[in-house]
């Protein structure tokens, strides 16, 4: 979809955050569970992903890229909603995505939250640093 090849490089049930996550998409979810999902992207991955999604080239963060990260967050949340249908974790509603710029923030998690983080590496021969190729999708959900 984004003209980008990725592979899973890690899964964790412990809350984690990328230290160089320049852009974070966040979306609320509710249904048989309640919580949120985040998409943490280094700037390079955000630019590559949105460039592929919109079939245009972006070299710096701008309103289109920020909006594109929100749309990617929405697409992933919609996929989770579909996959979790008719399970104890069924999601009936998702909110409008929000996008956080910068990495200097912390998220506090309520007691009883079930957390899952999946790390992906983007195949990008032009990017040497692993920190600029890895992004994360995180879910924090509690059954209601």
Predicted regions span which residues?
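N-terminal auxiliary interaction/assembly segments of multi-subunit proteins
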Residues: 1-144
